[in-house]
């Protein structure tokens, strides 16, 4: 998980750097989404019987015994 996060940030920075080299005027239009920009769920776990535990911006993904709250992207 940590390797994927570091790889995603590195690629995003490389892309931003190559775009900035082409035109310094377009640097204001670049938006880089990071995991910190994702909405946070009210709870990490949920139940199919009480779906509202995740919050408004998250969805309950069912597993055999319990569910996981996943942010809506």
Swiss-Prot record:
Molecular functions per Gene Ontology: sodium channel regulator activity; toxin activity
The reply on keyword Secreted is yes
> Which cysteines form disulfides?
41-58, 46-60, 54-69
- What are the residue ranges of the propeptide? 21-37
Recite the UniProt keywords alphabetically.
Disulfide bond, Ion channel impairing toxin, Knottin, Neurotoxin, Plant defense, Secreted, Signal, Toxin, Voltage-gated sodium channel impairing toxin
Where primarily located? secreted
One further remark on this entry is: The name 'gympietide' is derived from the name in the Gubbi-Gubbi language for the stinging trees (gympie-gympie).
Q: What biological function has been recorded for the protein in this entry? A: Neurotoxin certainly responsible for the defensive, persistent, and painful stings of the giant stinging tree. Inhibits inactivation of Nav1.7/SCN9A sodium channel in sensory neurons by directly interacting with TMEM233, a newly described Nav-interacting protein. Has virtually no effect on Nav1.7/SCN9A function in heterologous expression systems and in neurons that do not express TMEM233. Also weakly but significantly affects Nav1.8/SCN10A. Coexpression of TMEM233 with Nav also confers ExTxA sensitivity to Nav1.1-Nav1.6.
- Please state which protein family the record places this protein in: Belongs to the gympietide family.
- State what protein this is by name: Excelsatoxin A
